[in-house]
Design a protein with these regions (language model features):
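Short pre-active-site segment immediately N-terminal to the catalytic Zn-binding motif
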Residues: 324-329, 380-400
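C-terminal, non-catalytic "cap/extension" segments appended to globular domains
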Residues: 12-14, 21, 27, 122, ...
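Catalytic zinc-binding patch centered on the HExxH motif and its immediate surroundings
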Residues: 322-327, 361-382
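Conserved helix-loop functional segments at active or binding sites
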Residues: 338, 342-349, 375, 405, ...
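Active-site metal-coordination segments of metallo-dependent hydrolases
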Residues: 418-430, 461, 490, 528-535
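Active-site recognition of the HExxH zinc-binding catalytic motif
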Residues: 259, 390-410, 431, 436, ...
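Long, K/E/R/D-enriched contiguous segments that form extended
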Residues: 298, 302-345, 385, 408, ...
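A well-structured
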Residues: 2-321, 607-609
Length: 609
């Protein structure tokens, strides 16, 4: 795709809503109905090709079926994308919610009707003819098709797969939708003490509240956490039961029906990673957690505290409000784009295209989905980015992070839809790298004191994206075992989570009892079990890549880096990274990332007054 370069200044840009009319202009229009009918027509044609599925099918016929399947899938992605983005923009909208249900049912029906092709290739064609077809098809598809054959042993019969696909709409998907609807409607009351008075402040968007856990004011940090955790604890009965049911359904399907080795193996195989690789990653995180214990002890000294409390984990190292810089949205955008441009003009140009297409929703408002994400619908369409921008420095980092995801998608836009998305372990390769570019740019004009503040923020972020995420996965392993095998109660799961926190922080931090309910606040546990280790993987990988970039320089590094990003999901992660000189099967590789973190902590200590 061509790179867009906007010439106007971004300094005066304001937060706003996205324009999703590139997907569907009006879901109630005749035009949209015609679009849905065109999907049905193609689907009937595809179903009629079933007679071609013989062992001796020609490679041309096979490739034609692949392209037909992709054409249908692309149209479904567009209709589903519009429904989801409408819903995320306003989760209280009954129309948007109804459209999501309609599109999910349609997608499930279409998936069921195309299932015969997938199952035929996985289980019914012999090994020799499968390899013949794989070797004859364009290279971009080959690893994906090999992986399909690899996971074939976990596939069930066509009728069984259809039943599972149909039940998902009213099963796990319905449960996560209830979780989203319930939690997005939460209202929070933060209580702040001023002398003998208690002042209450209401929040109807948890992102606004959560941003205060990084406030320079310790009372605000503590009050924000207490308000957040109190609401989730009050609703833990329902939220906990939703989680229990998700785990039982995950276990029933993955272990009892499909025969996976363990609950996490489902995610590992989907990521095209060996269990042993993930185990090595998690072991490295546990072995190096003391690095962050050292940091938390140092941070408590910088904050003038005897010992750091969990409420103050993300406290800025300066408690002066004047040191907590606020950014206008325009300045944040300008800074991020400049950092991208310093690295590579193409990197910046791709990010600018998101603004040119108005594919960003950045304002905070009631009923909008919290957090931030990048949604890539198809290779041909510019990705969509959702933010909840409140002007703190972390929001600027989030902006860079999500635009990194968008750039990753755009660099992979030459890949077919089937292999367009990077696998989870590589999904953070551009987003975290983009954050590091931003940090370097921001440090250029900083004083020693400001660099110290930025460095502490970076280490805080590395804790949050490496150790915290790895320990989330370790918690999930234990929670799935406890619920799946022993029918653990919600209180028992909370105790498992508290034990996890105690190992994670050791004696470096004081943990109050209310944090045992933090787990019901983590949406990844509900939406995508065992997802979070990919953040640990991605961040440690990027630390290695960034080190390589600084050693080699742009001219040598950029082509290799872009090759990784442009591959999308067309290559096995181990093989793709090996070409760049990175062997993720070696324990020493993961240690390099932690050594880099340790260097940063030493730099922080050296900057102390």
């Amino acid at each position: 795709m061509p790179v867009t370069r906007m010439t106007s200044s971004y300094a005066n840009m304001k937060v706003g809503r996205w324009d999703i009319s590139d997907l569907v202009k009006d879901p109630s229009s005749e035009e949209f109905s015609r679009f849905l009918r065109s999907i049905e027509e193609q689907l009937v044609q595809f179903e009629g090709s079933r007679q071609l599925l013989r062992p001796d099918i020609s490679s041309e016929e096979f490739e034609g079926l692949i392209h037909m399947l992709e054409s249908i899938s692309e149209k479904v992605s567009i209709t589903s994308g519009h429904a989801y983005l409408s819903y995320y923009a306003d989760t209280s909208s009954n129309e948007a919610s109804a459209l999501v249900i309609k599109m999910e049912k349609l997608a499930s029906e279409i998936s069921n009707r195309m299932l015969f092709f997938d199952l035929w290739f996985k289980k019914q064609i012999d090994h020799e003819n499968a390899n013949r077809l794989i070797n004859a098809i364009p290279k971009a598809y080959q690893e994906h098709l090999r992986h399909k054959r690899l996971v074939a042993k976990y596939s069930l019969s066509e009728p069984e797969e259809k039943i599972i696909s149909t039940l998902e709409v009213t099963g796990i998907r319905a449960l996560t939708k209830i979780y989203d609807k319930m939690t997005s409607g939460f209202e929070f009351t933060m209580k702040l003490r001023h002398g003998r008075k208690t002042i209450e402040k209401k929040f109807d968007n948890k992102e606004k509240l959560v941003s205060l856990v990084r406030s320079p004011d310790g009372n605000r940090r503590e009050a924000a956490y207490k308000s957040l955790l109190q609401v989730y604890k009050r609703n833990s009965g329902v939220l906990g039961e939703i989680y229990q049911n998700i785990i039982m359904q995950w276990r029933d399907e993955a272990i009892l029906m499909r025969g996976y080795r363990s609950p996490i193996s489902v995610r590992n195989i989907a990521n095209n990673l060996d269990d042993a690789t993930v185990e090595a990653l998690l072991a490295a995180c546990r072995n190096n957690v003391s690095i962050f214990h050292d940091y938390f002890i140092e941070k408590s000294k910088m904050l003038g505290m005897k010992k750091l409390h969990r409420y103050h984990l993300y406290a800025p190292i300066s408690n002066k409000a004047s040191d907590s810089k606020k950014f206008t949205y325009g300045k944040a955008v300008e800074t991020v784009l400049d950092s991208f441009g310093d690295f590579d003009p193409q990197f910046r140009g791709h990010a600018e295209r998101v603004f040119a297409k108005h594919h960003i929703d950045s304002e905070i408002r009631k009923a909008k989905r919290g957090g931030a994400f990048c949604y890539s619908v198809t290779p041909k369409l510019t990705p969509y980015v959702l933010l909840n921008f409140d002007g703190i420095s972390r929001d600027v980092s989030t902006l860079a992070h999500e635009f990194g995801h968008a750039i990753h998608s755009m660099l992979a836009s030459d890949m077919p839809l089937m292999v367009f998305h990077a696998p989870l372990p590589l999904a953070e390769t551009a987003s975290v790298f983009a954050e590091m570019l931003l940090n370097e740019k921001m440090a250029e004009k900083m004083s020693k004191k400001e660099r110290r503040i930025l460095l502490a923020e970076q280490i805080d972020n590395l804790y949050a994206t490496i150790i915290r995420q790895a320990y989330f996965t370790l918690f999930e392993i234990n929670a799935h075992k406890a619920i799946g095998e022993n029918n653990a109660t919600i209180d028992a799961v909370s105790r498992i989570y508290m034990d996890n926190l105690k190992e994670q922080f050791g004696t470096s931090i004081i943990i109050s009892p209310d944090f045992e309910w933090e787990w019901v606040y983590i949406p990844h546990f509900y939406h995508t079990p065992f997802y979070t280790y990919a953040y640990s993987f991605g961040n440690l990988l990027v630390l290695s890549l960034y080190k390589q970039y600084k050693l080699e320089g742009r001219s040598s590094f950029v082509p290799k880096y872009f090759k990784i990003l442009s591959a999308g999901g067309s290559r096995k992660p181990e093989e793709l990274l090996m070409e760049a000189g990175i062997d993720i099967s070696r324990q020493e590789f993961w240690q390099q990332g932690f050594d880099y973190v340790q260097e940063m902590i030493q730099q922080l200590k050296a900057l102390a007054p």
